[in-house]
Amino acid sequence: MAKTPVLIVGAGPTGLALALRLAHHKVAFRIIDRNGGPGQASRAMVVQARTLELYDQVGLADEVIAQGIIVDVAHVREGGREIASLEFRDLGAGLSPYPYPLCYAQDDHERFLAGKLAALGCAIEWNTALEDFSESGGKIHAKLATGESCEAEYLAGCDGARSRTREVLGLDFPGGTYAHSFYVADVKLAGDQRNDLIANLGDGGINLSLPVRRNGTTRLIGMVPDEMRERDDLAFADIAPHVRKFIGVEVEEVNWFSTYRVHHRVASRFRVGRAFLAGDAGHIHSPAGGQGMNTGIGDAVNLSWKLAEVLQGRVGESILDTYESERLPFARKLVASTDKAFSAMVDQGIAARLMRKWFIPRLAGLTRLPAVRRTLFRTISQLRIHYRVSELSEGEAGEVHGGDRLPWVAIGDGGNFASLRGLAWHVHVYGVAQARLSEAAAALALDVTVFEWSDAAEAAGIARDAAYLIRPDGHVGWGSARQDADSLVAYARRIGLRAA
């Protein structure tokens, strides 16, 4: 019987991200997928700033950006008339080293991640489906459709909305399906490609166009007209007049066209014993805001370092409980918020139509205000995700609480995020480090990085001469305005953190 520390089921963006992080943590794994290779079609296509920050920790961000397209401007139109526009390229200036959303087609994205895995000597086992599994004796015993059996310390179900992992665990997947049908098409438009997002509001709901590939391909997304909703033979030619009406230019070439329904569901649990759910296996939601794939990658990062720390004896196994307690509430909140936003965009009732016609245009005008722009960026980029109520979160200093994402500070070479590339617990001090703190950190085998105090650190909400213990995922675990070394030692003891 084959044995592995971690069995990853599913080689989409979530499973691939989990595999890459485990590889960088030097944790062995197997990754299997029922399909014959990476996906050939692209649904998700927006990579948010937080995902790029997480990619930077493993040296991938620059390559992803080079292959993707930075959105320059977002235009909001109603009835063919522009009612608002928003500069996207520097929307989050000062908040992140990546102050923009990036368009990067999911199929290209998956091939890129798979290639990086291969370069690390890690093979994806295609045409290998999970058939069944059970847990006994502190192990996962999995049966694969190939007839092979596999024993694992842990199993991560990253196998999508039709997750076999979730099915075997018997977990509920409550939620629903929106009534409308939607179309998606990758096309070549007449004229030069613009790196802009265009949202067209009207009685037909919302229709979007945005760049998807560097070869000049544009992604079109919208609602199928009501009179065509029940057709199962719908082709792009059938909706072409509808599309032409809202984009205002001719479609010269259609590379891909599909229709689909949108669902919103969250699994009742993200962990049962030694098995975990991540990505679409645990939550699916509307495409509003481009959150789905990024949330799955966030799941993978959260789970990866906890598995690595446990398997390598750095922390106790109880830390794995915090995967569900940190990620499940966020998934529920995200599904609820995207459901409200999506319903407002697509509903055909009088209230929704009035909102699109009157309220949204006026709200869009507020994006000229810097505070509104910053709030908008923090929300869509996932920088606002925090774990303040987690068992792993303690203390605060300045505006930064335990559980918050470490604020980015543009200081030195690469900013304060450069030290996060070690994927290890790490102490930051902004100002002067006390000897007692350094001694306590050394006893726990924690590196300490001291940054010169700066206006940029103050603007980010960091307290002068404060100490912050940063988790391997870039979130703050512990903070102390007084560099309380005894408090750091007590925190480490409480969560089971010990010297490697």
Report each predicted region and the residues it spans.
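Conserved FAD-binding catalytic core of PHBH/FMO-like flavoproteins
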Residues: 66, 108, 115, 122, ...
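Core beta-strand elements of the Rossmann-like FAD/NAD(P) dinucleotide-binding domain
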Residues: 4, 145-154
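N-terminal Rossmann-fold NAD(P) dinucleotide-binding loop
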Residues: 15-16
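Active-site-adjacent segment of FAD-dependent monooxygenases/related oxidoreductases
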Residues: 43-116, 211-212
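Helical substrate-recognition/capping region of FAD-dependent monooxygenase/halogenase enzymes
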Residues: 2-5, 9, 24-25, 34, ...
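Glycine-rich FAD pyrophosphate-binding loop
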Residues: 23-43
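FAD/FMN-dependent oxidoreductases across multiple families
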Residues: 67, 233-291, 295, 315, ...
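A conserved short coil-to-beta-strand element within the FAD-binding core of flavoproteins
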Residues: 126-140
